[in-house]
């Protein structure tokens, strides 16, 4: 049985190292009991059943570095089934689009192309009886998200009638032939959790853990790449809780009523894992169930534009003449995409369950170094180093 357990753990660790990497780290279930001697103070092996034992024997502290690097979190859009905007244009005649209609939301359950999240933090754990850890991390995180333009509700107004765009005109086309990507700044992040060695048999340990993490970075750069509306905004600002039509000064540098684009990241996780100690090396394999959300309050960001036209243009949108050879002077804005905007929707985990493989290297029962890979619900790697006081 012991040989079989060794083989299974080593095979899983090898497969994880050569496969793809991917929620929060599960960690080694043996962590609470690996470092039994202190770097500064000598460790005490307290027995909770000993009537002479004190809390000084029961409690110890560990600290170290915590690095978690998610290369591809599998996310989808959390949005309603309908989206309120102008009616879909039909035929070749221009028209005014001032009445809102509920149309099928192209962002509903849309899958994202890529989502990355990187965290570097300090780690501190309160250990009880060399069996249970209560820990927290304090550090900084930054991220990157990319998806089809429909996942961000990229919309615009096309084929509008008249020599001006009225303040009550609504966007009438959803732009699907594009990509939207955003980069966040590096912001403070924290997490709390608990881990316990629930069952031990010889060199094998079965444990469980729970974690919660949070961060609130601002969007540093927003790039919209589309053949009919292309723009990039540094430190974008937009409108939260504002329905169409957007204010007439939307996109102008001096626009009022805008707020910074901030993403509220939350994640919780529960997991279980099994380890087997081989001298100084402790490989482990585990499973985890996690839920992550990235919520920007559905902020809507307008394409940057000039307050007044220069060379008859307010934004760098191409003309879309189609089969028309002459411009209709009565419909000055009909062949240019107007009032373009995108919305940073709420994103959430598409897959909840994942598999974890990793190993811990222990030195003198005082120091340890852990490397971990996570699969299925994300591709991620985790490294940590810690010592016992």
From Swiss-Prot:
Part of a disulfide cross-linked outer membrane complex (COMC) composed of the major outer membrane porin (MOMP), the small cysteine-rich protein (OmcA) and the large cysteine-rich periplasmic protein (OmcB). It is found in: Cell outer membrane. Transmembrane segments: none annotated. Pfam families: Chlam_OMP. One of its GO terms (biological process) is regulation of cell shape. In elementary bodies (EBs, the infectious stage, which is able to survive outside the host cell) provides the structural integrity of the outer envelope through disulfide cross-links with the small cysteine-rich protein and the large cysteine-rich periplasmic protein. It has been described in publications as the Sarkosyl-insoluble COMC (Chlamydia outer membrane complex), and serves as the functional equivalent of peptidoglycan. Permits diffusion of specific solutes through the outer membrane. One of its GO terms (molecular function) is porin activity. The gene is ompA. It comes from Chlamydia pneumoniae. Keywords: Cell outer membrane, Cell shape, Disulfide bond, Ion transport, Membrane, Porin, Transmembrane, Transmembrane beta strand, Transport. Belongs to the chlamydial porin (CP) (TC 1.B.2) family. It is a multi-pass membrane protein. Its main location: membrane. GO terms for cellular component: cell outer membrane; pore complex. This is Major outer membrane porin. InterPro entries: Major_OMP_Chlamydia.
């Amino acid at each position: 049985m012991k040989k079989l357990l060794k083989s299974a753990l080593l095979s899983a660790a090898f497969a994880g190292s050569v496969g793809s990497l991917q929620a929060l780290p599960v960690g080694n279930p043996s962590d609470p009991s690996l470092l039994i001697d202190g770097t500064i103070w000598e460790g005490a092996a307290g027995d909770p059943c000993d009537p002479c034992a004190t809390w000084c024997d029961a409690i110890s502290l560990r600290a170290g570095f915590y690095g978690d690097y998610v290369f591809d979190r599998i996310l989808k859009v959390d949005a309603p089934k309908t989206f309120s905007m102008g009616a879909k244009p039909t035929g070749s005649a221009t028209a005014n689009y001032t009445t809102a209609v509920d149309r099928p939301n192209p962002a509903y359950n849309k899958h994202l192309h890529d989502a990355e999240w990187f965290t570097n933090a300090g780690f501190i754990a309160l250990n009880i009886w060399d069996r249970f850890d209560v820990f927290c991390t304090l550090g900084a995180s930054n991220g990157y998200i990319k998806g089809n333009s429909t996942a961000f509700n990229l919309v615009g107004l096309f084929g509008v009638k008249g020599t001006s765009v009225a303040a009550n005109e609504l966007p009438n086309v959803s732009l699907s032939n594009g990509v939207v990507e955003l980069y966040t700044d590096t912001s403070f992040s924290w997490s709390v959790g608990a881990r316990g060695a629930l069952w031990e048999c010889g060199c094998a340990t079965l444990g469980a853990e729970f974690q919660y993490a949070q961060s609130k970075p601002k969007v540093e750069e927003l790039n919209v790449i589309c053949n009919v509306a292309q723009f990039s905004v540094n430190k974008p600002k937009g409108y939260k809780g504002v329905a169409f039509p957007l204010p007439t000064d939307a996109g102008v540098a001096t626009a009022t009523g805008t707020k910074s684009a901030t993403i509220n990241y939350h994640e919780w996780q529960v997991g279980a894992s099994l380890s087997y100690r081989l001298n100084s090396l402790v490989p482990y394999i585990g499973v985890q169930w996690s839920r992550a959300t990235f919520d920007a309050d559905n902020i809507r960001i307008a394409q940057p534009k000039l307050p007044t036209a220069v060379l008859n243009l307010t934004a760098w949108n191409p003309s879309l003449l189609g089969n028309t050879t002459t411009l209709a002077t009565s419909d000055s804005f009909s062949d240019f995409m107007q009032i373009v905007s995108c919305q940073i929707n709420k994103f959430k985990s598409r897959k909840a369950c994942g598999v974890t493989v990793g190993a811990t290297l222990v030195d003198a029962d005082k120091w340890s170094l852990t490397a971990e890979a996570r699969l299925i619900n994300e591709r991620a790697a985790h490294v940590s180093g810690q010592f016992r006081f």
